[in-house]
Amino acid sequence: MARSVVAALLVLLSLSGLEAIQHAPKIQVYSRHPAENGKPNYLNCYVSGFHPSDIEVDLLKNGQKIENVEHSDLSFSKDWSFYLLYYTEFTPNEKDEYACRVSHVTFPTPKTVKWDRNM
C-alpha cells in the first residue's frame, strides 16, 4: 500500500513539473504562395515549440489587428511543446505592412514579427 501511494505521489509530482517548464515560441510569418501585388494569397503565422499552452496570436495589417483570422487546433509535439497556425486571406501590395504579434508568458512584452515578402 505504501509503495503505491509513493508511486502515485511521484507521478503527480512529475506531471505538475511539466507546468513549471517554460519554452518561448518560435514565430514564423510567411505567405502560402510567392507574393504578387494585387493577387489574393494567404498570410500564415506558425507558432511552435512553446510551453505552457496559454498564448495569444494576432495577425496585423499596418499595426492594426486583422479580424476574421482562422487558426488550427492547439497541438503538441513529441516533446510536449505546443504549436498553432493562424492564417487569413490577404492581397499584398507595395504599401501595406503585415506582421504577427504573439503574447506568451516567456515574453516580457508581446513580440511582433514582420512578414518578409521575399521569403
Swiss-Prot record:
InterPro entries: B2Microglobulin (IPR015707), Ig-like_dom (IPR007110), Ig-like_dom_sf (IPR036179), Ig-like_fold (IPR013783), Ig/MHC_CS (IPR003006), Ig_C1-set (IPR003597), MHC/Immunoglobulin (IPR050160). GO terms for cellular component: extracellular region; MHC class I protein complex. Residues 1-20 form the signal peptide. Disulfide bonds join 45-100. Keywords: Disulfide bond, Immunity, Immunoglobulin domain, MHC I, Secreted, Signal. Its main location: secreted. It holds the Pfam family C1-set. The keyword Transmembrane does not apply. Belongs to the beta-2-microglobulin family. Component of the class I major histocompatibility complex (MHC). Involved in the presentation of peptide antigens to the immune system. Heterodimer of an alpha chain and a beta chain. Beta-2-microglobulin is the beta-chain of major histocompatibility complex class I molecules. This is Beta-2-microglobulin. It comes from Saimiri boliviensis boliviensis (Bolivian squirrel monkey).
